From Swiss-Prot:
Disulphides: none
Compartments in which it is found: Cytoplasm
Protein name (database record): Holo-[acyl-carrier-protein] synthase
Any single GO CC term annotated in Swiss-Prot or TrEMBL for this entry: cytoplasm
One GO molecular-function entry: magnesium ion binding
Function text: Transfers the 4'-phosphopantetheine moiety from coenzyme A to a Ser of acyl-carrier-protein.
Gene of this entry: acpS
Entry-linked Pfam families: ACPS (PF01648)
Organism: Oceanobacillus iheyensis (strain DSM 14371 / CIP 107618 / JCM 11309 / KCTC 3954 / HTE831)
Length: 119
């Protein structure tokens, strides 16, 4: 049964400015595994990557209904499967099924999360 839906969109230039202004921003948002992948990406791809992860984590917090605070950015990890599709793992939410979609354009990153209870 669906118990939550969340969506978030962010401008890539806003994310790029956040990264440039605050060097610790990446450490606050990404888990260690996500940071390792981030470091291997090209400069252009880095902005898309962190913007997509940020939007996905915000979308999850909206689906839960608490916003970021009860769940932290580092409690949420997004790892791509063998086909490149993103999968979300969240500490304390093992009893839920989490559906995630992330998309990018030249100017935006958007993420959608559907949260289900296991029956």
């Amino acid at each position: 049964m669906i118990c939550g839906v969340g969506i978030d969109i962010i401008e890539l230039n806003r994310m790029e400015a956040l990264i440039e202004r605050n060097e610790r921003f990446i450490e606050r948002i990404l888990t260690e595994n996500e940071q390792r992948k981030f470091q291997r990406l090209s400069a252009n791809r880095k902005v898309e990557y962190i913007a997509g992860r940020f939007a996905a984590k915000e979308a999850f917090a909206k689906a839960v209904g608490t916003g970021i605070g009860k769940v932290s950015f580092k409690d949420i990890e997004i790892i791509n499967n063998d086909y490149g599709a993103p999968n979300m793992k969240v500490k304390g939410y093992n009893d839920n099924v989490i559906h995630l979609s992330i998309s990018h354009s030249k100017t935006y990153a958007v993420a959608n999360v559907v949260l289900e209870t296991r029956e």
